[in-house]
Amino acid sequence: MGNIRGERTVDIDAPIERCFDIAADVDHAPEWQGSLKDVEVLERDGEGRAALVETESDAKVKAVRATLRFTYAPPGQIDWHQERGDVKSLHGWWRFEDLGEGRTRATYGLDADPGRMLGMLLRGPVEATVRDFLLGNAAEGLKQRAEAG
C-alpha cells in the first residue's frame, strides 16, 4: 500500500491572521478538528506555540498516536512532521492565502505512509474513506471556527 495523500481547500470569511492563529493553537485543535482526539504539548517554541506535540487521532479503523514536530511561518504556513508514532511517516501542513476584504483561502494537507501493519487495515475503499475523513474534517472545522468569530 502506498501513501495516503490529499489536500482540502476552503475559502473562509475571516482574516488570514485569525485563521493562522486558530490553526497554530494546537492545544485547542481537538475542539474543532473532529478526527483529533487528544493533544499533549511536550515543548513550546520561543513564541509560546506548540513545537513538539503528542497526538491521538481517530483513523476510523484504529486510534493512531504520533509525536509531531511543528514549524510556523506566519501568517501563511504551518508544517508538521512525525518524529515517532504508529504510522511509518507523516507530514501535514496548512497553507493560508489572503484573498483580501477579510477573506482567506486555507489548504490543509496530509501525506502519510501507514506502514505495513496499519496499511493492511486500510485497503481498497477503506483507504478513500479514511483519507476523506482525515482531510475533510480539518478544513471545514477551521472554517466554522474562524467564521464563528
Task: Report residues per predicted region.
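Intrinsic-disorder/low-complexity, polar/charged segments enriched in Ser/Thr/Lys/Arg/Asp/Glu/Gln
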Residues: 3-11, 50-52, 65, 77, ...
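Hydrophobic beta-strand positions in extracellular immunoglobulin-like domains
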Residues: 12, 57, 110-112
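Hydrophobic pocket/interface hotspot
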Residues: 19-23, 29, 53, 70, ...
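Beta-strand/loop substructures that line and gate deep hydrophobic ligand-binding cavities in soluble
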Residues: 81-136
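Glycine-rich portal/gate segments that line the openings of hydrophobic small-molecule binding cavities
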Residues: 30, 40-87, 136-149
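Well-ordered beta-strand positions
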Residues: 11, 71-72, 97-98
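Hydrophobic ligand-binding cavity/cleft-lining segments
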Residues: 1-48
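Short strand-connecting beta-turns/loops that link adjacent beta-strands
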Residues: 15, 46-47, 75, 99-103
